[in-house]
Amino acid sequence: MNMLDVRSLYVTYLSEEERVEAVRGIDFSAEEGKVTGIVGESGSGKSTAMLAVMGLLDHKAAVEAEKVSLFGNTVRAGDNAAIIFQDPLKCLNPTVKIGRQIAETVRNRKKCTWREAKKRSEELLDSVGIRH
């Protein structure tokens, strides 16, 4: 059984000036207990594809997929899954306060206002005893 199954994944970045298709209809799967790698040229969409599956792309990216399933269950991007970045410096930006980084993620995932995202970020930090 595949742990992760992704079918017909498309990612398009939208702006007022242009529309850029970063990922065009890719399929991939990861089998439980196996190491899976996605390889390709620089700029071919490897990181964009994984960030799309995890729900970590910003609000300017349109993500569509025929299927994203985790252990056979259809999931919304980012639910019940995590990603470990190869470069640990990409996990958190040391030049940006943690509250802002959390708020940006909340805003992108929940499609809410900046004020709502900031409030949620503060609630999350309070819940684990981190001063903001």
Question: What kind of region is each of these model predictions?
Answer:
Residues 116-132:
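Conserved ABC ATPase "signature" region
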Residues 39-41:
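The feature captures the beta-strand-to-loop junction immediately N-terminal to the Walker
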Residues 36, 47-60:
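Short, conserved post-Walker A segment of ABC-type ATPase nucleotide-binding domains
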Residues 37, 79-86, 100:
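ABC nucleotide-binding domain signature
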Residues 5, 27-29, 69:
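ABC ATPase nucleotide-binding domain
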Residues 63-77:
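Conserved ABC transporter NBD signature motif
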